[in-house]
Amino acid sequence: LASEGARFVTAIAPAPWTLPSHITMLTGRHPAAHGVNNTDRRLADEIPTLAEVLRGQGYATAGFVAGPYLRRDYGYDRGFDLYDESLVADGRASHRGTTSPQLVANLSSWLAGEREAEQPKPFFAFLHIWDVHYDFAPPPPFDTLFDPSYEGEVDGRNIGFLKSSMSERDLEHVVALYDGEIRFSDRELGVLFEKLRAWGLWDNTIVVLTADHGEEFFEHGKIGHLMHIFDEAIQVPLIVRYPPAIDAGLVLEEQVRLMDIAPTILGLAGIESSRLGMPPEAPVREKDLSPWLRGDFLAGSIPDLVAFPENYGGGRVGVRMNQGKLIRHNEDYYELYNVRPELGERERETGKAPEVIAVLAELIQQEAEWNEWKKDGAIVAPSMTLSDPLREQLEALGYIER
């Protein structure tokens, strides 16, 4: 896919977990602007979604999901003609077994029906592949694809109970199972892409592949996600393929954000991103990246800043730029990391280093701007009561306490 489209080397999620990142992806708003930062918050009705904008422009719209944080309880279904959450229906554990083949089959069935319509519409489909999420239990042959000789007892389930003291060999196996999940999901996406080719849709469809967060494997002492805002948890893949506008093999090194995806899709489709409704006075706004994808590298600057002002990652807040990241652990302790991949965020300046003070000033200014904007009438995410089935699914994943 990347060889036929554009690959963003440094795409950054606005949070190290599913709920706020997906709301950002589908609204073009930073979590500080949409407010869905906790398990008991849902998307405000006043905030437009990408699906609503596209349906208003005559698109058929459908979503297919398999994770509890994607349930319609949170407001995701707005703007979708069909929002299929059958694979995360009441009574399902939500993270046991495989779901990608059924998701692809459901989407393919919907697309086939749309193609048979008397007057087919352009379509927008949102597909949430869940199998890469833990538990890491890919089906054969993917369970042994990357580590066929392993004879230990670790099986990739209940990874939240694994300790950093586990053997290096066992950890290698966990990573191999994760890689197996990725390869399995890759195969299932290939099935979908082949259908698009067979139907003559492949070369006139905007295809965006990304993720809501990464995974930690004790690079900084934790496993899973939610715990830190180091790059292993927030740097994600982002590939965009659309032959009418994007040269094959394009690689963009600049840092971009998940909040830029929705306006970029609209830009490639010839629709004004202002329809997403973000107030112009908001401290951080979405960016339509379609000019860069079309090869116009003089079309202004790509924002060099991703802020994490909502206490993600164990009470830490921070800001990430193209070359550095500041993490504030508390009012008296800060760290500045070089984010070059080969350094693994292990070289740091602490305390009162000039570099820390300069970036800290940027973070403090952003926090002040956000707080002022919120006081002046920014939309507040409404609270919600978790249904019993949703609560059970989140408990099973270890996201909330029993």
Feature map (PLM): residue ranges:
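Catalytic domains that recognize anionic headgroups
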Residues: 1-402
